[in-house]
Amino acid sequence: MYKRQKQIRAAGFNAFRDAHQPHHLDYQKYWDEEGILFWTQFSAHVWYDTPEFRENFKKLLRQWVKERRNSPSVVMWGLQNESTLPREFAQECSDLIREMDPTAKTMRVITTCNGGEGTDWNVIQNWSGTYGGDVTKYDRELSQANQLLNGEYGAWRSIDLHTEPGDFQVNGVWSEDRMCQLMETKIRLAEQAKDSVCGQFQWIYSSHDNPGRRQPDEAYRKIDKVGPFNYKG
């Protein structure tokens, strides 16, 4: 775990986002020590409208906040990624977070990502170049008022598959070269828009298997949907 943290730090990242469930507490200990900004995540696209689910969700939410509220690296509370929570329940959970962590009223923001209502902020995801879109417009898209922070960007690849250099192809072969070309373009264009955007989160540091898989039938996705990673590029 420590080696993973060191690799992330050595790669030049200055912020970390859980993907998409709570990680081991040693991660936040390291982020505290190294001054890395931490966007902690509680859940991902899950909802069952039963009293038992609601109560257990809030019980686990309280534990999550209690374990992390005194960590100086935490700057964002991520209630749910691609949220399916009803607005009223998300508001109830946000109020619970603010009750347990008064800094969430004035300093720390409560979020969903790529969908959701009832929190302070639904952070966008911009996967241009991966799921369609025009990657050459990335800097202009990030500069829009509703973008500000990109919660996810990334690229598909097939390990050890290489292609000849050339212009970027949106529907090209998922080679390592194409992945590098896309990632380099997005990093460069985000830097050009740095006065209009506060950051972007590359998805994802690691996953269980070859990241060249295709959804929805890749590997153990169906039985492993609750984590510790949800499979995306």
Language model features with spans:
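Substrate-binding/catalytic cleft of secreted carbohydrate-active enzymes
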Residues: 5-7, 15-232
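Short, small-residue-biased leader/transition segments that mark boundaries at the very start
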Residues: 1-2
